[in-house]
Amino acid sequence: MSFPKELEKVLEITKAQNVWRRTQTLNLIASENVMSPLAESVYMSDFMSRYAEGKPYKRYYQGTKYTDEIETLAMDLMNEITNSKDCDLRPTSGTIANAAVFRVLAEPGDKALIAPVQAGAHVSHTKFGTLGALGIQHIEMPFDEENINVDVDKAIKMIEEVKPKFVVLGGSLYLFPHPTKELAPHVHAVGAKLVYDAAHVYGLIEGKVWSSPLKEGADIMTVSTHKTFPGPQGGAIFSDGSEVFKQVSRTIFPWFVSNHHLHRLPATAVTAIEMKYFGESYANQITRNSKALAEALAERGFKVIGENLGYTKSHQVAVDVRQFGGGNKIAKLLEDANIIVNKNLLPYDKPENVSDPSGLRIGVQEMTRYGMKESEMEEIAELFKKVIIDKKDVNKVKKEVIDMRKNFLEVKYTFDDMKDLEKYSSKSLKLII
């Protein structure tokens, strides 16, 4: 029997996606990354067909002995590279991780202080997202415009006056670290907890180019496992032995997660092993690339945010493109040239401008994993200039992008061949390859 037309269409769309995004585009979305072929190989396993409610060795289903093993191993590996004591991999996203933490720390009507939206607070921290859905009142801490960050002195005063149930740091437009160490003592002095959303910078934390929030006073840290940490899409929660973690871990199931998408677990474990051996060099190259791209864009006439601070300390670069038509127009124009970024609110934008903000948010972590370095950041900046400033034919620029990608199709910061793999992996892993 030949394939029905509907099936042919599904296969055609999937193939087109794989060819386009894996081989023909510059993927510069700050919240995305790519797994290694090794991680992808264990992702496609029988685990994706199975259920396992509850914690390892305390399940509500039978048939979970290997799930218990791989989940425990993955948590141990994640704790090792994070230098933490507690890890829970059951949240299926960073937002679910946040929801589980927020719900334990506050009741409807309680108050939470968050980093200013101008300083990059994620939507889940706000009344428009998870906090609002839980009925928790969000109050933004004061913004320091010059440093694109929380205003520490004013925030301390607000913490003392408001006495919130918890304070959230971390963000989605996240160029510079939020002041964890400076605020933690004042948060704890009023009996509150400090939550750090490290979704975007987790790979930089375990790669030791970004300070560990848990070592600076955060009570609990939520992360995504697919941004600067290049694993499968999912979430995780970490702590250094806090009572809050125990409470959250007791309630993730059944409040927010039933089955937790078990095929993530071996892929997360593999990525943790990769980052154990290659994570520091990867994180260092990410930050060198983001700085190089920011400088190259500025040299070509773009208004790059944070010039007085060195532009960025993360994987992200933020660019004001109002003079060229705004973020919405320019993001679409770049996509026509196979350069994939997202429009983004900048610190001085009003929230109601979310559909057509001033800026672009650019992330270098995925193209870094494909092996790009500082010289390629210069080339990328030149491609931006051709599309946006020089107004070159986007189809001609698109051809340049495709030609450029031909040299960057192989995932780096992983085990290159079977000889490398044999040094570090068990016999069971070898059988999968």
From Swiss-Prot:
Highest taxon in the source lineage: Archaea
Name recorded for this polypeptide: Serine hydroxymethyltransferase
Family designation: Belongs to the SHMT family.
Modified residues annotated as N6-(pyridoxal phosphate)lysine in this record: K227
One BP term from GO: glycine biosynthetic process from serine
One GO CC term, this protein: cytoplasm
Its biological purpose: Catalyzes the reversible interconversion of serine and glycine with a modified folate serving as the one-carbon carrier. Also exhibits a pteridine-independent aldolase activity toward beta-hydroxyamino acids, producing glycine and aldehydes, via a retro-aldol mechanism.
Keyword Metal-binding assigned: no
Organism annotation: Saccharolobus islandicus (strain M.14.25 / Kamchatka #1)
The enzyme's E.C. designation: 2.1.2.-
Signal peptide location: none
Site (Plays an important role in substrate specificity): residue numbering on this chain: H226
Gene: glyA
Binding annotation for (6S)-5,6,7,8-tetrahydrofolate: A121, H122, V123, E243
Compartments (UniProt record): Cytoplasm
This protein's pathway: Amino-acid biosynthesis; glycine biosynthesis; glycine from L-serine: step 1/1
Alphabetically ordered keywords of this record: Amino-acid biosynthesis, Cytoplasm, One-carbon metabolism, Pyridoxal phosphate, Transferase
Cofactor(s) demanded: pyridoxal 5'-phosphate
CDD domains per the UniProt record, alphabetical: SHMT
Gene3D superfamilies named in the record: Aspartate Aminotransferase, domain 1, Type I PLP-dependent aspartate aminotransferase-like (Major domain)
InterPro entries reported in the protein's UniProt record: PyrdxlP-dep_Trfase, PyrdxlP-dep_Trfase_major, PyrdxlP-dep_Trfase_small, Ser_HO-MeTrfase, Ser_HO-MeTrfase-like, Ser_HO-MeTrfase_PLP_BS, SHMT-like_dom
NCBIfam families in alphabetical order: PRK00011.1 (NF000586)
Keyword presence, Cytoplasm: yes
Molecular function GO labels: glycine hydroxymethyltransferase activity; pyridoxal phosphate binding
